[in-house]
Regions:
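Conserved radical SAM core fold
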Residues: 78, 115, 140-143, 161-179, ...
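Hydrophobic faces of well-ordered beta-strands that scaffold small-molecule active sites
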Residues: 58, 106, 134-136, 157-159, ...
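Aromatic/hydrophobic pocket-lining residues that form the small-molecule binding cavity
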Residues: 91, 118, 182, 186, ...
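Anionic-ligand binding region
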Residues: 170-201
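Conserved Radical SAM active-site core
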Residues: 30-156, 165-166
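Alpha-helix N-cap and loop-to-helix initiation/capping positions
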Residues: 86, 113, 173-181, 217, ...
Length: 302
């Protein structure tokens, strides 16, 4: 199993395995220090209905990212422009406070580069009475070894599967190995949680949701993702097909990322999805590409 002290001195937690000495102030691709850095902890109502429910998901947004996609919708925290360093004890207390606010679950957003610290915080919080499900909300670019360090602690994996087209993974996320890496990670997630389980109120208690944000001009890539996931896992996992891509200023000169996804592009993806026989899927309706989906990373709850 990965060791926190060793990994922080030569970080190999994520698939980039860049070897940064985070313990002594050096940072790698994710830009994260050794101390957990978070930008917001609050109830969040914009996840899938089975995650947010009516009382909200207790969401912790971590700063830094091992992908840092050029079109990132949360680029302020991905680039470490906001966030506060907190201790493992403080993080465990944040989990308990969110539970006290009647959160349906604890939702860890972009947690990959803090896996080992999060493991310690979860163990501590569970000793103090944390009982709600734990959601690991990630970009899909995960090390199997890091995921195994969380085995038994994570109830729900809410993972992106961004690319099956290698050229897009390289151009947009500088991760040419994304497709194969995401396949291995997803297999480990499904191994840990098994088939999705819901309670009487429709809230997910255990399982995997695979998200795909349809990018402009990338219907072929999206279809390939859906086909792979459904061919491999069938109804064991749920798909979440999103059309809310919002072109932000950093991509104003990058075509086709400088436009919204069209209604027709999304309809083509849905038609294909239904033609495969997919039934376990969350879809979006109406005009949803708005910056209102992007929360304020103002340090609330940290």
């Amino acid at each position: 199993m990965l060791d926190l002290e060793q990994e922080m001195s030569r970080c190999r937690v994520c698939p980039r395995k860049c070897g940064a000495d985070r313990e002594h102030g050096k940072t790698g691709y994710c830009k994260a220090p050794s101390g957990v850095t978070a930008a917001r902890a609050a109830l969040h109502f914009w996840e899938e209905p089975c995650i947010s429910g009516t009382t909200g998901s207790g969401t912790v947004f971590f700063s830094g990212c091992n992908l840092r996609c050029v079109y990132c919708q949360n680029h302020h925290i991905a680039e470490m422009e906001s966030g506060k360093v907190i201790s493992i004890g403080q993080l465990s207390d944040i989990f308990l406070e969110l539970q006290a606010q009647n959160a349906n679950n604890i939702n860890l957003v972009t947690p990959s580069h803090y896996v080992l610290q999060i493991r310690e915080a979860l163990l501590l919080a569970k000793e103090k009475g944390l009982t709600v499900p734990i959601v690991y909300n990630c970009g899909g670019y995960e090390s199997v070894e890091a995921l195994q360090a969380l085995d038994g602690l994570i109830d729900i994996y809410l993972t992106d599967f961004k690319y099956m087209v290698t050229s897009l993974a390289k151009a947009y996320s500088r991760a040419e190995d994304y497709p194969e890496t995401a396949k291995r990670a997803l297999a480990e997630m499904v191994r840990q949680t098994g088939r999705a389980v819901f309670d009487e109120n429709g809230l997910m208690k255990k399982g995997v949701i695979v998200r795909h944000l349809l990018l402009p001009g990338a219907v072929k890539n999206a279809k390939a993702v859906v086909k792979y996931v459904y061919d491999t896992y069938g109804d064991t996992v749920w798909l979440s097909l999103m059309s809310q891509y919002t072109p932000l200023p950093q991509v104003e000169n990058i075509s086709p990322l400088n436009r919204k996804t069209t209604k027709r592009e999304y309809e083509r993806l849905l038609d294909y999805t239904f033609s495969l026989g997919v039934t376990n899927a969350f879809l979006q309706e109406g005009p949803v590409a708005e910056e209102s989906f992007i929360p304020e990373f103002d340090g609330r709850g940290i």
